[in-house]
Amino acid sequence: ANRKINDNLQQQVSVLYQSWFENFELSNGICPENWSCQELSTIANIASGKRPPLKSEVCNQETPIPIVGAASIMGFTSESNHRDKILVTGRVGTHGVVQRFNSPCWTSDNTLVITSPFYEFTNQILCRIDYSSMNRGSTQPLITQGDMKKVIVLIPDEETLAKFEEFAGSLMARWEKNCDENIKLALLRDTLLPKLMSGELDVSAIEI
């Protein structure tokens, strides 16, 4: 149920962005004169990830921190290189997957890490970039920091941008809460299921 709700929340934010910043429905279909095309680096900081100090396939007390790869979690390590709210996309290998993190993690050296005071607006931009046109690699796909910084985007006035962040942020706060609940439920399942299968946990006396 949470996954369906989250899909709907993401879709609502995407439709809102399209309505305001692509179809210009706030201004009768015309781009306002006080909006301007600028480089992505004017609203976002873009950096590369780093190679983790160690890598484990298992999440435990020694390696509790997820290592973020170009498209997904690729392992676990002992320390974080980010504790802030970040957006992550692939630098080497897989391109076009945008990941959100708001908890300690280690962004690997095949990622680009994006931070911005306009987090939700920047997220929508990243989800719409044509990454294939930026690829510099021949045998292995590669996108550079410099190319990402120079992506031209339409920047609205501060008031409109703040309103979008408020609306989109409230929807995505619900999304994050649902994601946290899904993780807790998965951990509970993974803890209880082996005990049920082995008979260690007896539920025969429970009335349903």
Regions found by a protein language model. Name each.
Residues C31-P32, S36-E158, E207-I208:
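DNA target-recognition domains and sequence-specific DNA-contacting regions of bacterial/archaeal
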Residues A1-V68, L154, E158-S204:
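Non-catalytic DNA-recognition/assembly elements of restriction-modification systems
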